[in-house]
Amino acid sequence: MQQGRTQTTVMLGLAQTLSWASSYYLPAVLAGPISRAIGMSYATVFAAFSVALLVSAATGPVAGRLIDHFGGRPVLVASNLVFAAGLTLLSQATQTSHVFMAWAVMGLAMGSGLYEAAFATVVRLYGQEARRAITGITLFAGFASTVGWPLSSYLESAFGWRETCMLWALLHLVLGLPLNVLLPRAGPVAATPEADSAAIVHASQSVATGNQP
């Protein structure tokens, strides 16, 4: 069981690093090139990103209910597909409305594929024994900015911002999706949802404050 939790932690940690690096940490690098290419102001580019945050907040509770019923694997797998779709749309954007649309799609993926979904997945799998897995996932994904910013910057300077978005989309399909497909299948719905919910809330608070769960 311990080995299974370790494998799950590593797979989710790697998948989370990819998801954060290719979404939350992307505008810091690509906002400038996007604004110059499309004729948008910096503020408008970040306004589009704010739409993603709003959509993500609205999507999160729905994703949580789906994870409660079906387990995290199908939800996280779907998030990789939606991430890839959103990044592809962004790579093809030629006007402001396209950028907003792409980030709205990205918001759907963020709401179903970032920390809250990963935490809910391990709680759904391991119940009160999920705390160490949550800590491990947090430690892995803590490197998302360390990986994402320099990699996005290098790709943008070497190939361009559109190609950078496409490469991140490809990574979701060839790396993130297989990692999530290989996650354990969830068993029957837990009999103590209150305890599970408390564990998720505690984990989220710990991430927000920088403490270990």
Please describe what each predicted stretch is:
Residues 7-42, 46, 59-63, 148-149:
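Extracytoplasmic
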Residues 58-97:
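Conserved MFS/SLC helix-loop-helix module at the cytosolic interface between two early adjacent transmembrane helices
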